[in-house]
Amino acid sequence: METTLFKPALWQIPHIGSGGETALAEKTETLKQRLHRIVGSHRDARFASSLAAEDMVITDLIAGENLNIGIFTLDTGLLHTETLNLLDRLGRAYPHLRIKRFRPVREDADRYVESKGRFAFYDSVEARRECCRIRKTEPLNRAIAGADAWLTGQRREQSATRTELPFAEYDAGRGIGKYNPIFDWSEHDVWAYILANNVPYNDLYRQGFPSIGCDPCTRPVKAGEDIRAGRWWWEGRNSKECGLHK
């Protein structure tokens, strides 16, 4: 008797039907205006791109509008091959853009591995947060040093901790303005823009990853699950942030 292995259906890129072009155009125009407002209000604004789908929308508009917003990403040293490949593709798609990479201090990362173990982040929330601090938070602080504003691709729909996310806020810990220009876009809006404008995106989205972080800390999500269920899945449901957005 043959045994058939059941494979659960995974999250998929939303199907985008016809008829929403006007609404998308209006949202896109609003997003453009927000980005222009940020540029007009700050001498040095920088966009922290995680290379997620929503970040690709913002990147495409920064390029298309020729906006004076610096773009950087955090290369944690633990990214998926697909994510690194996307960085190479972005260089070809937007040859006039320079996306800076910020990496962890090598000595700090090595010390963490030597003292705790290569996969210590699985052992406790504290150990995982320490890894995130070394590989994400500290490089972010260097990336925005000297800026007077930074931008994120956060959206209200992404998680329970972001439902009240505003367009503009003040990052008191770093003493600068912080903007979430795409905060009110839905997942459908994001993918409608990407597919309509042929914007590059991470190949992992086609493999059931709606939210993408470091390779050891991200896995595919089943259809119908919370989109961040694949992030740090071994922790509690309320522990789905890395500490960048305190």
UniProtKB/Swiss-Prot annotation:
Enzyme superclass (EC): oxidoreductase
The enzyme's E.C. designation: 1.8.4.10
Pathway per the UniProt entry: Sulfur metabolism; hydrogen sulfide biosynthesis; sulfite from sulfate
Cofactor note: Binds 1 [4Fe-4S] cluster per subunit.
Known catalytic reactions: [thioredoxin]-disulfide + sulfite + AMP + 2 H(+) = adenosine 5'-phosphosulfate + [thioredoxin]-dithiol
Cofactor(s) needed for function: [4Fe-4S] cluster
Any one cellular-component term (Gene Ontology): cytoplasm
Taxonomic superkingdom: Bacteria
Binding-site residues, [4Fe-4S] cluster: 131-132, 214, 217
Gene3D superfamilies: HUPs
Alphabetized SUPFAM superfamilies for the sequence: Adenine nucleotide alpha hydrolases-like
Protein name (database record): Adenosine 5'-phosphosulfate reductase
Species of provenance: Neisseria meningitidis serogroup B (strain ATCC BAA-335 / MC58)
Gene name of the encoded protein: cysH1
